[in-house]
A protein has these predicted regions:
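Stable alpha-helical elements in mature extracytoplasmic
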Residues: 105, 109, 120-123, 127-130, ...
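Charged, long alpha-helical assembly modules
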Residues: 556-635
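Glycine- and hydrophobic-rich flexible loops that cap the catalytic core of alpha/beta enzyme folds
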Residues: 244-255, 261-266, 270-414
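Gram-negative bacterial Sec-dependent N-terminal signal peptides
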Residues: 2-20
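Substrate-recognition/specificity elements adjacent to catalytic centers across diverse enzyme folds
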Residues: 24-234, 242-244, 249-257, 262, ...
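Hydrophobic alpha-helical segments
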Residues: 247-249, 379-487
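Terminal end segments
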Residues: 457-462, 466-527, 616-735
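Second-shell loop/turn segments in exported
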Residues: 58-61, 107-122, 355-361, 463-471, ...
């Protein structure tokens, strides 16, 4: 199928939606009428408080306000979700787009939109209208690709997490399969994939804490909302309507719901889950009479063959197309080859239900109503920490969990020819690790297993299938248990202090092994004298980060050097890198890593005794999604460290080309603490600022607060906004 045919099909199907059926003049008139029912109030941090007469009106205003702040990020998210990034970025993004197009098909989404519940269609219509009205009233804003948004496009990006399940498909292996003769993945690709799998990388995810009234000073439930994402991945805003909508929090750019946040009665915090809900099936493929079949039990079923076209911007700027013949079995699309078999990928694909669940939970007012929304079972990747003004707290595992035969190890490809490996429906919510109001008075998740969510009152691992968790405990999980068990009189301030507790739990295990290695080294070994000052410092260190701590710098650089020596071997041995570093590296390796760390610090900063804040920096130079960092430009010291070492307040930083300092790009991004008393009270901070425009005073106005962990008051109620309003206006009104 040619691109022209695809565009014609898209236009024909899109014409079925109300916003697309009228003329441009009629569209604009309808959009202006909607804008007249919407008010946007910008507070003194540039945060939008949007009110509409209906929920749809609020959606219109909310996405319009997002576009004002950073249209570039909105378009980038939908280029990714629709598999159209290569149209903007060129051939290098073709494989990313092909991966998405294995699941996302415009014609399918248009059909799903047409069958959606009327209330949801109204929200999607308003979403498209809001973005199109922004473009119509801001001609200086030049989209790279999407010049007109259609309502069905909202179904391509229905879940707010930074990494969808589809991203677990290896681009290298996808390229090896569809870019070369099948079953002949190159040695270079395999080597690249292995190197990427073991390299040091910042953990992604989040921290969520829910504190019951029994553990708080004032008898009100508390909720910590602390996503660890790429900086500036979400917008902070409030959306309200006369239909009962009143949600505040973090909304992923371009989506029309608050992903992590709260309303007047309840709050929700999502953390990336360790549950195994995406599976690979190794298919035995046969060729007969020029056709492909795969074995399934005693059957030989036909492989589904289709064509996918991926447009991309060629070097001359023109639009070119790559055409792929893709294959599927009933398990899913083929994404790679391994050991002489084709591997099919299975994951949740319920875009309508996922969008329903994402929006409806923002209107839940208590645990029961939140759980009712969860019965849609369209959340596959996120745990949830919940709290409400009735004093209830809860932990929910993801709701889309396929029921499987626990004899098989689903962390690896299973035999697709064996019907026993197939998914057998979904688990009931009651069959997953869930907790409500545990006696200890707190719940937490830090992207660790659910079996420490409530200390001794946690779900028991033996009661659940293996696939309910695929990671185990983590340093941040150990740290969270430590701070939450330490008191029973939490206030918003002390919960913030707990969220920024500086203890680095990973080094509590690792530094003693380094000390032992050093102490057992013979006195006549030259390394003993060379590393003596470093060991004196590390042995006396309290294992806490701070901007002035030289020990933090040395420990982090040592940890990174030892990780590089350990990760590949740990992967081969099937153990965690932390365990391998502590227990299986030799004394000589541990000391060599310390010498390397000392040399790096001295070479880059003049002395191994360099304060951590001189190295670890926050910098925002421009509004680009991928920023170029520069040691000669202003930056801010950040005291907290990587979540890799157990820091709850996570700052994922590293060196970049041309820099010696470390610059953060992920980790703490939006942080909020919410108290559910007679009136909800909240404090929050975002990385950098709300605006993506470097000329705006709200581009970096929160940066210092962010680095210091100083949260500001959230203006949730209209009376709180009094005296803090910069501007009130309706969409389309000029500045």
């Amino acid at each position: 199928m040619r691109i022209g045919t695809l565009l014609l099909l898209s236009a024909t199907c899109a014409a079925l939606s109300a916003p697309a059926v009228a003329s441009p003049a009629a569209d604009l008139a309808r959009q202006r009428a909607t804008a007249a029912r919407v008010e946007i109030v910008r507070d003194d941090w540039g945060i939008a408080h949007v009110h509409g007469k209906s929920d749809a009106d609020a959606v219109f205003g909310m996405v319009y306000a997002q576009a004002e702040d950073d249209f570039n990020r909105i378009e980038a998210n939908y280029l990714t979700a629709l598999g159209r990034t290569a149209e903007a970025e060129g051939e290098k993004a073709v494989w990313q787009d092909l991966r998405m197009k294995l699941f996302v098909d415009p014609a399918d989404l248009q059909a799903r939109y047409a069958k959606s519940p009327p209330w949801l269609k109204a929200l999607m219509d308003a979403w498209a209208d809001g973005l199109n009205f922004y473009l119509a009233t801001h001609p200086a804003s030049k989209p790279k690709v999407i010049t007109r948004f259609e309502p069905w496009m909202a179904l391509s990006f229905t879940e707010g997490s930074i990494g969808g399940d589809v991203e677990r498909i290896s681009l290298g292996e996808l390229e090896a399969f569809y870019g070369k003769p099948q079953m002949q993945a190159s040695a270079q690709v395999k080597a690249r994939e292995f190197a990427q799998a073991v390299e040091f990388r910042e953990p992604t995810g989040s921290n969520g804490f829910a504190i019951a009234p029994s553990n708080t000073k004032d008898g009100h439930a508390l909720l910590l909302i602390n996503p660890h994402t790429s900086f500036l991945f979400r917008s902070e805003l409030q959306m309200t309507s006369d239909e009962g909508l009143n949600a505040y929090g973090a909304a992923t750019w371009g989506q029309f719901f608050v992903y992590q946040g709260f309303n007047a009665h309840a709050g929700w915090m999502h953390t990336s889950s360790t549950v195994d809900v995406v599976d690979e099936f190794a298919e035995t493929v046969l060729r007969k009479d020029g056709k492909l079949f795969y074995r399934y039990g005693t059957e030989e079923r036909p492989v589904t063959v289709s064509t996918v076209e991926v447009p991309y911007k060629a070097a001359d700027g023109a639009l070119a197309t790559k055409t792929f013949t893709v294959y599927r079995t009933h398990h899913g699309p083929i994404v790679r080859a391994a050991d002489g078999k084709w591997v099919a990928f299975a994951m949740m694909y319920k875009p309508v239900e996922a969008l329903e669940q994402s929006f409806l939970r923002t209107k839940a007012v208590d645990y029961d109503s939140f759980l009712k929304v969860a019965e849609l079972k369209a959340n596959s990747s996120n745990n949830t920490l919940f709290a409400d003004d009735r004093g209830e707290v809860a932990y929910l595992h993801p709701q889309f969990i396929p029921r499987r035969d626990d004899r098989f190890d689903y962390t690896k490809p299973v035999d697709g020819a064996d019907p026993a490996t197939d998914w057998k429906g979904l688990h009931a919510l009651s069959e997953a690790p869930h907790l409500k109001n545990p006696p200890n008075g707190w719940l937490m998740n830090t992207n660790n297993w659910p079996y420490s969510a409530a200390g001794p009152y946690s779900p028991k691992q033996a009661d659940f299938p293996r696939y309910m968790d695929s990671v185990g405990e983590t340093p941040r999980g150990v740290h969270a248990t430590r701070v939450l068990s330490a008191r029973k009189d939490f206030t918003p301030s002390t919960l913030i202090a707990a969220a920024y507790d500086p203890y680095l739990t990973a080094f509590a295990d690792l530094i003693p092994t380094l000390s032992k290695a050093y102490d057992e080294t013979p006195d006549d070994d030259p390394v003993k004298a060379r590393l003596a000052p470093q060991m004196v410092a590390l042995k006396a260190w309290d294992l806490k980060w701070s901007a002035t701590s030289t020990e933090t710098s040395l420990a982090v650089f040592w940890g990174e050097a030892l990780w590089a020596r350990s990760a590949a071997e740990a992967k081969k041995a099937g153990v965690s890198t932390y365990v391998y570093m502590a227990e299986r590296t030799t004394p000589a390796q541990k000391l060599a890593a310390l010498a390397e760390a000392s040399d790096r610090l001295a070479a880059d900063f003049g002395d191994w005794r360099t304060p951590w804040g001189q190295i670890n920096r926050f910098q925002r130079n421009d509004g680009a999604i991928v920023q170029t960092f520069d040691d000669t430009k202003p930056s801010i010291p950040v005291p907290f460290a990587s979540g890799q070492w157990g820091s709850l307040a996570s700052f994922g930083a590293r060196r970049y080309p041309g820099t010696k300092k470390y610059y953060g790009t992920s980790g703490n991004s939006f942080v909020a603490v919410v108290e559910f008393g007679p009136k909800v009270k909240a404090l929050a901070v975002s990385a950098g600022g709300e605006s993506g425009d470097p000329a705006s005073k709200h581009f970096t106005d929160q940066a210092q607060r962010y680095a210091k962990g100083e949260l500001r008051t959230v203006y949730f109620y209209p009376d709180q906004l009094t005296g803090h309003v910069e501007r009130s206006y309706r969409p389309g009104e000029g500045r």
